[in-house]
């Protein structure tokens, strides 16, 4: 019987743990293990985010180059539109008469 009593006690020389205390200890151990898993997953997520940020930073020079290209291309249509507007103002009298003559010839 002494052997039976020794096997149920948590540590030799201490009192036996009640069912509640055993269940509480098991739950505490499970919670601690789950916290360790959560911590490991958070660390993995942090490393992944750092890798994504590093890749994004590698493309900053490419992004700057494309932005510069976009700005140049955006200015070109504006300059072209301004040039066309200037040409139309200079040639309004001649262009209108020539267009009407071509249309009249096609309708006859």
Curated annotation (Swiss-Prot):
Cellular component, GO annotation: cytoplasm; DASH complex; kinetochore; mitotic spindle; mitotic spindle pole body; spindle microtubule
Keywords: Cell cycle, Cell division, Centromere, Chromosome, Cytoplasm, Cytoskeleton, Kinetochore, Microtubule, Mitosis, Nucleus
InterPro entries: DASH_Dad1 (IPR013958)
Molecular function per GO: microtubule plus-end binding
Region described as Disordered: spans on this chain: 77-108
Function: Component of the DASH complex that connects microtubules with kinetochores and couples microtubule depolymerisation to chromosome movement; it is involved in retrieving kinetochores to the spindle poles before their re-orientation on the spindle in early mitosis and allows microtubule depolymerization to pull chromosomes apart and resist detachment during anaphase.
Subunit structure: Component of the DASH complex consisting of ASK1, DAD1, DAD2, DAD3, DAD4, DAM1, DUO1, HSK3, SPC19 and SPC34, with a stoichiometry of one copy of each subunit per complex. Multiple DASH complexes oligomerize to form a ring that encircles spindle microtubules and organizes the rod-like NDC80 complexes of the outer kinetochore. DASH complex oligomerization strengthens microtubule attachments. On cytoplasmic microtubules, DASH complexes appear to form patches instead of rings.
Family: Belongs to the DASH complex DAD1 family.
The protein's name in its UniProt record: DASH complex subunit DAD1
This protein's encoding gene: DAD1
